[in-house]
From Swiss-Prot:
This is Mitochondrial intermembrane space import and assembly protein 40-B. It is found in: Mitochondrion intermembrane space. The keyword Oxidoreductase applies. The CHCH domain contains a conserved twin Cys-X(9)-Cys motif which is required for import and stability of MIA40 in mitochondria. A motif (Cx9C motif 1) lies at residues 64-74. Central component of a redox-sensitive mitochondrial intermembrane space import machinery which is required for the biogenesis of respiratory chain complexes. Functions as chaperone and catalyzes the formation of disulfide bonds in substrate proteins, such as COX17 or MICU1. Required for the import and folding of small cysteine-containing proteins (small Tim) in the mitochondrial intermembrane space (IMS). Precursor proteins to be imported into the IMS are translocated in their reduced form into the mitochondria. Monomer. Can form homooligomers. It holds the Pfam family CHCH.
Length: 139
């Protein structure tokens, strides 16, 4: 016996083997590209950039959002042979802005450095503890 159960936002449908053997009669409805509530990708059907795309990770908002939009737009619409080579000023402005907010825009080098420092402290701590243990056992 097949049935459906709602759990919060999820709808769970239990079906039998017989249900799977019967061809589906469901009709698919084509997505409306003009539906403002329909999730879109990075590039909208009209070719514009979708600044609300979760794939941008919020970069289009925040203190450097305008600089990001300027640099990203320049790159996206660039017609240069080396795409984006005409956007250096915009990317430089974005980078300068991001350096003003290191807590919001950590650089990979900074993250690597912090991780290495943490590992070094952990290693120093374990070396100190093991040498203390050796001194106690030898006395």
């Amino acid at each position: 016996m097949s049935y459906c159960r709602q759990e919060g936002k999820d709808k769970i449908i239990f079906v039998t083997k017989e249900d799977h053997e019967t061809p589906s009669s469901a009709e698919l409805i084509a997505d409306d590209p003009n539906d403002p509530f329909e999730e879109q990708g990075l590039i909208l059907p009209n070719g514009d950039i979708n600044w609300n795309c979760p794939c941008l990770g919020g970069m289009a908002s925040g203190p450097c959002g305008e600089q990001f939009k300027s640099a990203f737009s320049c790159f996206h619409y660039s017609q240069e042979e080396i795409k984006g080579s005409d956007c250096l000023d915009q990317f430089r402005a974005m980078q300068e802005c991001m350096q003003k907010y290191p807590e919001l825009y950590p650089q990979e080098d900074d993250e690597d450095e912090l991780e290495k420092e943490k590992q070094n402290k952990d290693e120093e701590s374990s070396v100190t503890q093991s040498s203390d243990t050796k001194e106690e056992s030898s006395s």
